[in-house]
Design a protein with these regions (language model features):
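N-terminal subdomain of nucleotide-sugar transferases
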Residues: 1-56
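Donor nucleotide-sugar binding/catalytic pocket of nucleotide-sugar-dependent glycosyltransferases
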Residues: 39, 55, 138-187, 193, ...
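Glycosyltransferase donor-sugar binding loop
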Residues: 43, 205, 226-239
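A short, charged, and often flexible helix/loop element on the N-terminal side
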Residues: 52-80, 92, 132
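An aromatic- and histidine-rich active-site surface loop
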Residues: 90-117, 122
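Nucleotide-sugar donor phosphate/pyrophosphate-binding loop at the beta->alpha transition
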Residues: 112-114, 121-143, 153
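Conserved donor-binding/catalytic core segment of Leloir-type glycosyltransferases
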Residues: 194-225, 229
């Protein structure tokens, strides 16, 4: 099978969208499928892409979050790229701008599309100082996912959010834990003794950004015998 993956964000910027695309590439390669990644050009890529071809497009940084890049590619350009690759299916990773044009290209070529909803763009608009755009963004998300052949969402809550936008071709695609990276065998009693001897550690590992609402973890901070730990980077990380 030949799979074209269009990603709104990609390496070298690492986030949930990038991470899931890399996992998909790894699994598709293991099954012997051919892949093409279409994504913003944002810098040198040194990560193993598991044999995937890449088509990196000119992009511009998002003013309020420069690590995120926006591609303004015409559907005709994407249609030409896809026609040359001849995909059996188009995978749209967190589609919004590039994904909308990619969806139009897939439709033009009569290729089925699978859209993966994993970014709450409405919350982004509200958290990054554009609350007046939230309703417009929500309508766009609804149109996009209603147009896709199938939409995958990671949770019951996100499925319900899409249903409220009139999206009906839905399946849940849950997220697991990378047990090669995270497991009890990696526990370090020496490290725990240094940072929180005898205390219960409540930890957060991920991107530090307004939409993650990490401040909610302040609630257990006052509990006796509890220490908070944060590991990650992003726009909310103190300079």
């Amino acid at each position: 099978m030949r799979v074209a993956l269009l990603a709104e964000s990609f390496l070298p910027h690492m986030n949930g969208v990038t991470g899931s695309v890399l996992q998909v590439l790894r699994h598709l390669a293991a099954e012997g499928h051919e892949t093409l990644v279409i994504a913003p050009r944002a810098g040198e890529i040194t990560t193993d892409l598991h044999g995937a071809r890449t088509e990196l497009l000119r992009s511009a940084p998002l003013p309020s979050y420069p690590e995120v890049r926006v591609v303004f590619a015409r559907a005709a350009r994407l249609t030409a790229i896809l026609r040359e690759f001849r995909p059996d299916v188009v995978h749209l990773a967190s589609p919004f701008v590039l994904g909308w044009q990619g969806l139009a290209a897939a439709d033009a070529l009569r290729v089925p599309s699978v859209a993966v909803y994993q970014t709450d763009v409405v919350a982004y608009a509200e958290k990054y100082g554009m609350p007046q755009a939230a309703a417009l963004v929500g309508r766009h998300i609804g149109r996009l996912h209603r147009r896709a052949t199938l939409t995958l969402a990671p949770s019951t809550a996100s499925l319900q959010q899409l249903e409220r936008l009139g999206v009906d071709r839905l399946r849940r695609w849950g997220r697991g834990v990378d047990v090669e990276r995270f497991g009890p065998e990696r526990r370090s009693d020496g490290w725990r003794a240094q940072v929180a001897r005898g205390a219960t550690i409540v930890g957060y590992v991920g991107r530090l950004a307004p939409e993650k609402q990490v401040e909610g973890l302040a609630a257990p901070a006052g509990l006796p015998g509890t220490r908070l730990g944060f590991l990650g980077g992003g726009p909310s990380r103190p300079a």
